[in-house]
């Protein structure tokens, strides 16, 4: 069982895909890591040697901000935007889309479920 950055990588997957289970490492970063550590990308996680796992772990720790550190940094960035009261911070505070999307009809993901409005009765 390969354990990198506190994450158990899935045994049956290829190393290239297994590394993407770590928060902060996508497919492009995964391929870059594998190339730098000269590990065969077709190798399954269960077939990695201890030296290969250590090489991957060392390279990731030196060159990438992952898991808790990355989550903390993102949270602090959002908190900073909210505190300075800029447009993006206000959108975060109100729970609305931050990147300029229209909100008249869509944006349900950010706004949450629809809120019922009482209908007017006709006379």
UniProtKB/Swiss-Prot annotation:
Assembly mode: Part of the 30S ribosomal subunit. Forms a loose heterodimer with protein S19. Forms two bridges to the 50S subunit in the 70S ribosome.
Which UniProt keywords are given for this protein, alphabetically ordered?
Ribonucleoprotein, Ribosomal protein, RNA-binding, rRNA-binding, tRNA-binding
Q: Which InterPro entries match?
A: Rbsml_uS13_C, Ribosomal_uS13, Ribosomal_uS13-like_H2TH, Ribosomal_uS13_bac-type, Ribosomal_uS13_CS
Q: Which cysteines does the record link by disulfide bonds?
A: none
Q: Name one GO biological process term.
A: translation
Provide the taxonomic classification. Bacteria, Bacillati, Bacillota, Clostridia, Eubacteriales
A Pfam match = Ribosomal_S13
What is this protein identified as? Small ribosomal subunit protein uS13
Entry keyword Transferase: no
- Give the superkingdom in one word: Bacteria
* HAMAP family per record: Ribosomal_uS13
């Amino acid at each position: 069982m390969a354990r990198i950055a506190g994450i158990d990588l899935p045994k049956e997957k290829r190393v290239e895909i297994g590394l993407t289970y770590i928060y902060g490492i996508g497919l492009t970063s995964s391929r870059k890591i594998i190339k730098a550590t000269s590990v065969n990308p077709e190798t399954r996680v269960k077939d990695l040697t201890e030296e290969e796992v250590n090489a991957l772990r060392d390279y990731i720790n030196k060159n990438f901000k992952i898991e808790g550190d990355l989550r903390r940094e993102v949270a602090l960035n959002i908190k900073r935007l909210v505190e300075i009261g800029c447009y993006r911070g206000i959108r975060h505070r109100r729970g609305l889309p931050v990147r300029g999307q229209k909100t008249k009809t869509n944006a349900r993901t950010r706004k949450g479920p629809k809120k019922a409005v009482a209908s007017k009765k006709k006379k």
